């Protein structure tokens, strides 16, 4: 089944060029199917690029997915036209009384910013508190993982001395876990973060189950036993060129970044990179939609089962 989006969203034409089945809202109204309602809180600066990445992954499920985009930062964006935000994004007040099957909270380039210095930190806390009673399952990505661990579990910000950037190998810990069903025993995924996620920290201070980690003991994928919250510390949604764009941006800014690990062929930034994580990213999102959202969400969202404690 396709994803459902507003007719004029730029991602419609972009994804159709990749043979992705996108159904405009005007056509979807003629189908007697209860789609999954998924809300995306997009915290990334280049919002259109991020929309394309997540919509691509959501589109590969056999389930029909109705996507709504949420913003909580009222400041003028330097990377996304205000017309786009006004046309395709809702504010929290627009949806605070609604229920959703799923919520995705994206990453954000805030790894070196203290939580209380984040301009929209109060709004982040508000959304996470609201989600306990209004969302069946929430998926946190990269920086959002760090924010959620602080808000939900009181874990202080853990920061690496150097940025972790590259494509790293991970291994699954529970072969029969639903979120990793169909995963290879070892798989690759991109990372781009200052945030640090030692697996020992997650085990010692939360009741979350770690499902995949690196050989160095960094947690990559973990979730609550009731499937209400899931965390992925990398960026499985990234395009093949995203890490390269970040690298060259930092080079131009005079930051002397390290070449992303295991990314450029022959470790040469002049050779175009290839994505080695695409199948993993697709399977992760299919599993989340199926086992963490579809299998446990009520048919009538008015019968949402609160609350996440």
Curated annotation (Swiss-Prot):
One CC-aspect GO term: cytoplasm
Main enzyme class: transferase
Location (main, coarse): cytoplasm
Its EC number(s): 2.3.1.46
Biological role: Transfers a succinyl group from succinyl-CoA to L-homoserine, forming succinyl-L-homoserine.
Keywords: Acyltransferase, Amino-acid biosynthesis, Cytoplasm, Methionine biosynthesis, Transferase
Record protein name field: Homoserine O-succinyltransferase
Sites annotated Important for substrate specificity: 192
PANTHER family reported in the protein's UniProt record: HOMOSERINE O-SUCCINYLTRANSFERASE
Native species: Enterobacter sp. (strain 638)
Catalytic activity: L-homoserine + succinyl-CoA = O-succinyl-L-homoserine + CoA
Site (Important for acyl-CoA specificity): 111
Family membership: Belongs to the MetA family.
GO molecular function, one term: homoserine O-acetyltransferase activity
CDD domains hit by this protein: GATase1_HTS
Location(s), subcellular: Cytoplasm
Record-linked InterPro entries: Class_I_gatase-like (IPR029062), HST_MetA (IPR005697), MetA_family (IPR033752)
GO BP, sorted A to Z: L-methionine biosynthetic process from homoserine via O-succinyl-L-homoserine and cystathionine
Keyword presence, Transcription regulation: no
NCBIfam families: metA
Pfam families: HTS
Pathway: Amino-acid biosynthesis; L-methionine biosynthesis via de novo pathway; O-succinyl-L-homoserine from L-homoserine: step 1/1
Active-site residues (renumbered): 142 (acyl-thioester intermediate), 235 (proton acceptor), 237
Binding site for substrate: 163, 192, 249
